[in-house]
Amino acid sequence: LEYNPCEGISAKGGKPTQKKDSLTDQQVEVLLETVKGLPPYLFTMIGLYAGLRREEALALQWDCVFLDAPTPYISVRRAWRSEHNRPVISTTLKTKAARRDIPIPKCLVNCLREAKAASKSEYVIADSEGQPLSYSQFKRVWQYIVVRSTKERTYYKYVNGQSIKYTVQPSLGGHQKNNPNIVYSLDFDVTPHLLRHTYITNLLYAGVDPKTVQYLAGHENSKTTMDIYARVKYNKPEQLFDVVNSAFHQAVPS
């Protein structure tokens, strides 16, 4: 052999990567209805309709949001990171491919225009003092979504000096006991990355070619885009019928 076919292979085991489905159109509608008027709304809209990574959205400044251009777009030029719970904004992006200009749909244009009119900060998503969010501030913002989920919760209470574990399973449409204004309206998991994954998936469903999706998503490796593309393209048996039928078009011997 002129090369070692096992080179680079690790003997270490590991858990398989968990494949996450994107949000359905109905779930997106429910999510947006749930967070409308709440702190995570703008971040959610940017994730769903521009596909920005969390570090890109939290670093986004108004000088990179072009709402009045013939084709409105967002320029990704900065990245956020947290150091000792302090936000650090840098022009060093995750990869070279992360630097990109993303056309944005009308719904996001309108959302950003409204946010800009009310903003006193150079940052699109900012705290009460106009500064970028710290890690703990972002977690508190995202908690508005978490507390409205029907996901099972566990907590501990001290009873007679002992720590007792309790499990609570909220029911869809129910109200939080301590805060009746909070309605359990989300019976599906939502993460910041899932917003971006939904954006990418919807582009592929709409027939946008994978190379263009790779650019819009800021994927340096085309494999990342193509893995999603394969799942989107071949996720339903009825969509595979013609492919399989063509591959085995020969008549079966009687």
Set out the residue ranges of the language-model regions.
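Short functional hotspots where side chains directly engage DNA or cofactors
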Residues: 7-8, 71-76, 125, 191, ...
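Basic, Lys/Arg- and aromatic-enriched nucleic-acid-binding interface segment
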Residues: 2-60, 70, 97-98
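Short, basic (Lys/Arg/His-rich) helix/loop patches that form interaction surfaces
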Residues: 29, 33-38, 50, 102, ...
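DNA/chromatin major-groove-contacting recognition/catalytic segments
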Residues: 30-34, 85-90, 206, 227, ...
